[in-house]
From Swiss-Prot:
Its main location: other. SUPFAM superfamilies: CcmK-like. Keywords: Bacterial microcompartment, Carbon dioxide fixation, Carboxysome, Repeat. This is Carboxysome shell protein CsoS1D. Gene3D superfamilies: 3.30.70.1710. One of its GO terms (cellular component) is carboxysome. Homotrimer. Forms a dimer of stacked trimers, the same faces interact. Probably forms a CsoS1-CsoS1D-CsoS2 complex. It is found in: Carboxysome. One of its GO terms (biological process) is carbon fixation. Contains 2 BMC domains, trimerizes in a staggered manner to give a hexamer; each subunit in one trimer interacts with 2 subunits in the facing trimer. Each stacked hexamer can form a pore of about 14 Angstroms in diameter. Dimerization of the trimers forms a channel-like compartment, accessible via an open pore. This channel may be large enough to accomodate transport of substrates into and out of the carboxysome. Disulfide bonds: none annotated. InterPro entries: BMC_CP, BMC_dom, CcmK-like_sf. Residues 5-106, 108-213 form the BMC circularly permuted domain.
Length: 213
């Protein structure tokens, strides 16, 4: 499968409680639990993800939590308690498509912002949208982040939760852009933003060069 483009290869060593619970709520497959190791892979074209999911599942004991097949991109999420199983399945996928982790696309921050002292109207509107996380409370600060490709948003969310006392409102890792919404005090949301930015920088240190990134 030499014609497969590796867009996202994102390993998380230990899912944080809020993110794990969010993924379990939104998962169409086998739900993860806090502390699981997790690997998010995005490839193009989208249909290739079926074959890659099959290879990953047959390589070790990992479970498949998500698989989304779009025309342009395909995404899969695998997880397991033992990091070694997740990493071994990831290596099996990389061998199949003749790529290394460093061949993945870099992550571009398309938007980042902290909105302080959210108004009741704004909070209510966000809470009534199709979110699967906690409710946004008026008066709190809201951290929003958008990444391209979409799949990297999960790792950014995990590290932001690890670094700061913030509440996960929503995280969407499919389509052209990934979107993250978190809530907390002004200081905590600023810390979450710094952690997310540092995570993206570490991803880009081991990614291929691409125009516009």
């Amino acid at each position: 499968m030499n014609n497969i483009d590796l867009r996202v290869y994102s390993f998380i060593d230990s899912l944080q409680p809020q993110l794990a619970s969010y993924l379990a709520t939104s998962s169409q497959g086998f739900l993860p639990v806090p502390g699981d190791a997790c690997l998010w892979i995005e490839v193009a074209p989208g249909m290739a993800v079926h074959r890659l999911s099959d290879i990953a599942l047959k390589a070790t004991n990992v479970r498949l939590g998500e698989q989304v097949v779009e025309r342009a991109f395909g995404s899969m999420e695998i997880h397991y308690r033992n990091q070694s199983d997740v990493l071994a399945s990831g290596e099996a996928v990389l061998r199949e498509i003749n790529h290394a982790q460093e061949d993945r696309l870099p992550c571009r921050i398309a938007w980042k912002e902290i909105i302080r002292a959210i108004t009741p109207d704004h909070a209510t509107l966000i809470n009534r949208q199709l979110r699967k996380g906690s409710m946004l409370l008026p008066g709190k600060s809201m951290f929003i982040l958008e990444t391209e490709p979409a799949g990297y948003i999960v790792q950014a969310a995990n590290e932001a939760e690890k670094a700061a006392h913030v509440t996960l409102i929503d995280v969407r890792a499919f389509g052209n852009f990934g979107r993250l919404t978190m809530m907390g005090s002004e200081a905590e949301t600023e810390e979450a933003m710094r952690a997310a930015e540092a995570t993206i920088a570490s991803i880009n240190a081991r990614a291929r060069r691409a125009e516009g990134f």
